[in-house]
Amino acid sequence: MVFPSQEEQIEKFEKDHVAQHYFEVLRTLISKKSVFAQQVGLKEVARYLGEIFKRVGAEVEIDESYTAPFVMAHFKSSRPNAKTIIFYNHYDTVPADGDQVWTEDPFTLSVRDGIMYGRGVDDDKGHITARLSALRKYMQDHDDLPVNISFIMEGAEESASMDLDKYLEKHADKLRGADLLVWEQGTKNALEQLEISGGNKGIVTFDAKVKSADVDIHSSYGGVIESAPWYLLQALTSLRAADGRILVEGLYDDVQEPNERELALVETYAQRNPGEISQIYGLELPLLQEERAAFLKRFFFEPALNIEGIQSGYQGQGVKTILPAEASAKLEVRLVPGLEPHDVLDKIRKQLDKNGFDKVELYYTLGEMSYRSDMSAPAILNVIELAKKFYPQGVSVLPTTAGTGPMHTVFDALEVPMVAFGLGNANSRDHGGDENVRIADYYTHIELVEELIRSYE
């Protein structure tokens, strides 16, 4: 099979008037800042998307009764008993903070050397326009769709999709029974293989706080008075072994072990090994798991307790000889199937009490359950086979990713097979400076989604 080069894909993209039209829509979307964490631009972007979909004949519903509006767009086939594909996407992005390095304005879509840059170009606005481009390209040559297509677009994905469960419960009757749900995004790995995955880890995040005194105390008392930071550090250390295993009683009892197929998929396709990880990130500390099989099992199928940040005492210039009265930390546990956020936090609370650290106060912030698809579902196998036609380096099929998203929420409401694949690359820098997508990959995603629609003829 002969595959087009990146240059040929760019040339096709530049000559494709449908792709060019929605590239301009993407340019507008990038320019419209929509950050849930800052409550900026959410209604404006939701309404703009609603108009874009209405113009091409979709039945559009915009629900502004939530903190971030939901946009649903339906394209109906006239065929009796037509199946349904759902595309789940989000229009919110993370901020483009001042500490991120951007070569150009993050809210101006720019193109350099065949690569497009901008906040949300991969996560996730570019996926919306690429998938709509695919649908419109199919409709150029056909009077009807062979399959019903629905888009669900939310504006709070980057903040744990806080209302998604309630929204889907309200609309479940019109969405249940779909043949397939295509997840918000995906990427190619470092070997240029398209990663096709069917799940993600969950998460529970929480704050830990300690107050040891009414005021900071002179550090000359350090030999006889316990300080908040020492107390907190000892408490946190008691929760994790040196090899990274979580030391919380009962936590692993409910973990759903991977089956043989899931282990085999990871062993065959996962392009993450200890040596590469160390090199990519310039690690100065040893890995918690050096042996590849144990590394992969830990990465994909086991929970992880992480410290996101610690704060206490004086951090200014020079010295300040004190015993800080307060200390706090932001923590998270990455969850796997079988673990529920509130239950995990309850177990941590009990373990801290048992370990003698009852003065540590815990505050739940957010949580999401984890999910793994059945990667042998016929609709998912169809995607895998179709993708092989478009990616010269092949595909990498993974039962789950180590990241987090609301897959469990969607499955719980709709009970539909879900698969993730997209237009990103191994260096797309989502959430960082110079977020980017190669134009060739963007256009290949359009072609694959169009072929997916055609496969239902």
Predicted regions mapped to residue ranges:
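N-terminal helical capping/dimerization or prosegment-like subdomains
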Residues: V2-D99, E326, D343
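An extended, acidic, His-containing surface patch that forms the Zn2+-binding/catalytic region
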Residues: P80, L191, L247-E326, R334-K347, ...
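A common structural junction motif
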Residues: D92, L239, D243, R349-D358
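Flexible glycine/proline-rich, aromatic-decorated loop/lid segments
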Residues: E195-K211, F421
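A short core secondary-structure module
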Residues: K166, G222-D243
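Acidic/histidine-rich catalytic neighborhood of metal-dependent amide-processing enzymes
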Residues: D124-G199
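Active-site metal-coordination/substrate-binding segment of hydrolases
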Residues: A82-M153, T444
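Acidic, glycine-rich active-site loops and adjacent beta-strand->loop/helix elements
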Residues: Y91-T93, I115, I152-A160, E184-N189, ...
